[in-house]
């Protein structure tokens, strides 16, 4: 079953989508204040579709 386009994604799901390690996503989060995933219990990150789109753009610009 696939998630809705509007569903929140975990850092692992976003990393797989972008083919980018999770530590890189955390680093980008520390350098780009526009990336603001929702943090839930235990500090787990959940990325909104807008966050994912922003990360796609950042990856594209850094390549």
From Swiss-Prot:
The lineage of its organism: Bacteria, Pseudomonadati, Pseudomonadota, Alphaproteobacteria, Rhodobacterales. Gene3D superfamilies: 1.10.1660.10. InterPro entries: DNA-bd_dom_put_sf, MerR-type_HTH_dom. It comes from the Bacteria. The keyword Ribonucleoprotein does not apply. This is Uncharacterized HTH-type transcriptional regulator in himA 3'region. It comes from Rhodobacter capsulatus (Rhodopseudomonas capsulata). CDD domains: HTH_MlrA-like_sg2. GO terms for biological process: regulation of DNA-templated transcription. GO terms for molecular function: DNA binding. The keyword Ligase does not apply. Keywords: DNA-binding, Transcription, Transcription regulation. Residues 10-63 form the HTH merR-type domain.
